[in-house]
A protein has these predicted regions:
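Local sequence-structure signature of Cys/Sec-based thiol-disulfide redox active-site neighborhoods
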Residues: 1-25
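ATP/adenylate-binding site constellation spanning eukaryotic-like Ser/Thr protein kinases
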Residues: 7, 35, 47, 65
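Short, flexible helix/strand-to-coil boundary loops that buttress conserved ligand/catalytic motifs
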Residues: 17, 64, 72
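Thiol-based oxidoreductase modules, predominantly thioredoxin-like and allied folds used
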Residues: 25-38, 49
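A short, hydrophobic beta-strand/beta-hairpin element that forms part of a small beta-sheet core
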Residues: 51-61
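Short acidic DE-rich linear segments
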Residues: 76-83
Length: 83
């Protein structure tokens, strides 16, 4: 399953969720608005912006239509090849 870490008032988060829904991708939303521990954990892992999207095989941060398209094409596993 895909997890999308978001925060209230995050335009990139909304764009990511809307595009994933439009492409028929199932995902869990993890709202970290009031979860400072989770926000810190994501920062320690190197993520500096939201949303953070975690698939079975990889993760990325920010609005990334290319990665979302890969997930839609390949199921929950995004292509591991970096471009």
């Amino acid at each position: 399953m895909i997890n999308v870490f978001t925060r209230q008032g995050c335009p990139q988060c909304e764009r990511t969720k809307n595009l994933m829904k439009a492409k028929g991708i199932e995902f869990n939303v993890v709202d970290i608005t009031d979860d400072d521990k989770m926000a810190e954990a994501l920062k320690r892992q190197g993520y500096r912006q939201l949303p953070v999207v975690m698939t079975e095989t990889e993760a990325w941060s920010g609005f990334n239509p290319q990665k979302i398209a890969e997930v839609a094409k390949n199921g929950t596993k995004a292509n591991s090849t970096q471009g």
